[in-house]
């Protein structure tokens, strides 16, 4: 199973383009083949990062991926190794050149341009502007009946999640005061440079003091221990369209756990769980109902009442209906997820064979069995010669 693109880049589902670009540049630098020669794992990670960035940096592809997963973007992201080292697949060249500059040109504390940026006029270096740590995504399972799935439903759910601390308004500080991190000086990053025969390499990591925020809290709030978040309970409304299937999921952006100290909230991911049904078996947007009918009713025909997802209806069993016949009731299936209309209901007709019979019923059946009109031979069936009998006729 392919990895989730958001997990590959280490960002939440509500991440904006700048966060995605920043995560991509860090990971592209970390796993670049030139920095990890003869390292197959690093090469595979590099391809994954580029593939994820190609999809998530494109608004249309990201929308399709959020709605349909990997199936929504097909093979386009993987066709050329994503946004590979030489810009294949639609990645932003300035991101790649900036990563090369970090590796081969830019010093540990320098902010000037160099390397590929000098050669190709690369974009301006980013500056750190911390807005708190991204809250984590929250995943819940929502059980739905087939009737709810058939028509769509709105659910009101109570969920437990991390919410902003009321005592400090989510700042983590009693007074709301913060100061620049003395370790990274507000950048949120620490760099370690090393020189090799191939040039200078720079390893970039999140600052361990501030956790990558660039600022640290003064006068920590005693209610949340300076985190700015506490466990709480909220009510959310989830609108589920008709036609969803088991393990489909809906993403509610910004409805997940709140981020520490004013950080953006993660997403709420609602995974659909379809309850087993008492009567129906689902087949795509169609449903199948098994109906047991007595032998006389199969032969003579009858009208019966059958359940549907819209309530019970009357249907006709035509005379001489054979066992395992599928009778169709149009438009009584499940609403289509995409487009209008609904699937159908199929009624599988089975013959009912009683286990216990009275003496009278047995005599009636014995008399019926003697009637030549109900035997297979009378209707041209059951008299086919076997292969060996046919061979005997030919050989003589």
UniProtKB/Swiss-Prot annotation:
Its cofactor is Zn(2+). Binds 2 Zn(2+) ions per monomer. Disulfide bonds: none annotated. One of its GO terms (cellular component) is cytoplasm. CDD domains: DnaJ, DnaJ_C, DnaJ_zf. GO terms for biological process: chaperone cofactor-dependent protein refolding; DNA replication; protein refolding; response to heat. Zn(2+) 2 binds at residues 181, 184, 207, 210. Pfam families: DnaJ, DnaJ_C, DnaJ_CXXCXGXG. One of its GO terms (molecular function) is zinc ion binding. It is found in: Cytoplasm. Keywords: Chaperone, Cytoplasm, DNA replication, Metal-binding, Repeat, Stress response, Zinc, Zinc-finger. This is Chaperone protein DnaJ. The gene is dnaJ.
């Amino acid at each position: 199973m392919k990895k989730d693109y958001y997990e590959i880049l280490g960002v939440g589902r509500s991440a904006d383009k700048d966060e995605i670009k920043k995560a991509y540049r860090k990971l592209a630098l970390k796993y670049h083949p030139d920095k990890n020669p003869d390292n197959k794992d690093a090469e595979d990670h590099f391809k994954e990062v580029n593939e994820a960035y190609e999809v998530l940096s494109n608004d249309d592809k990201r929308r399709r991926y959020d709605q349909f997963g990997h199936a929504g973007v097909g093979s386009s992201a993987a066709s050329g190794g994503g946004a590979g080292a030489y810009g294949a697949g639609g990645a932003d060249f300035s991101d790649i050149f900036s990563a090369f500059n970090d590796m081969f040109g830019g010093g540990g504390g320098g902010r000037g341009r160099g390397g590929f940026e000098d050669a190709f006029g690369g974009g301006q270096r980013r500056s750190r502007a911390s807005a708190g740590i991204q809250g984590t995504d929250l995943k819940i399972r929502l059980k739905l009946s087939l009737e709810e799935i058939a028509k769509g439903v709105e659910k009101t759910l109570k969920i437990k999640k991390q919410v902003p601390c009321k005592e400090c308004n989510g700042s983590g500080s009693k007074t709301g005061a913060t100061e620049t991190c003395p370790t990274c000086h507000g950048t949120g990053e620490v760099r370690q440079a090393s020189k090799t025969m191939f040039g200078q390499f720079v390893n970039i990591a999140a600052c361990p003091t501030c956790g990558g925020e660039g600022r640290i809290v003064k006068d920590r709030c005693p209610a949340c221990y300076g985190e700015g978040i506490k466990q709480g309970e909220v009510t959310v409304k989830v609108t589920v369209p008709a036609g969803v299937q088991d393990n489909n999921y809906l993403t509610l952006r910004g409805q997940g756990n709140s981020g520490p100290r004013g950080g953006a909230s993660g997403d709420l991911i609602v995974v659909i769980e379809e309850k087993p049904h008492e009567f129906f078996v689902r087949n795509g947007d169609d449903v199948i109902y098994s109906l047991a009918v007595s032998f006389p009713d199969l032969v003579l025909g009858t009208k019966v009442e059958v359940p549907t997802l819209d309530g019970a209806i009357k249907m006709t069993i035509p005379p001489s209906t054979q066992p395992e016949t599928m009778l169709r009731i149009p438009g009584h299936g499940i609403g289509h997820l995409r487009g209008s209309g609904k699937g159908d209901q199929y009624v599988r007709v089975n013959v009912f064979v009683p286990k216990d019979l009275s003496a009278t019923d047995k005599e009636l059946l014995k008399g019926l069995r003697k009637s030549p009109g109900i035997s297979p031979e009378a209707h041209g069936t059951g008299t086919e010669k076997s292969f060996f009998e046919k061979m005997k006729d030919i050989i003589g």
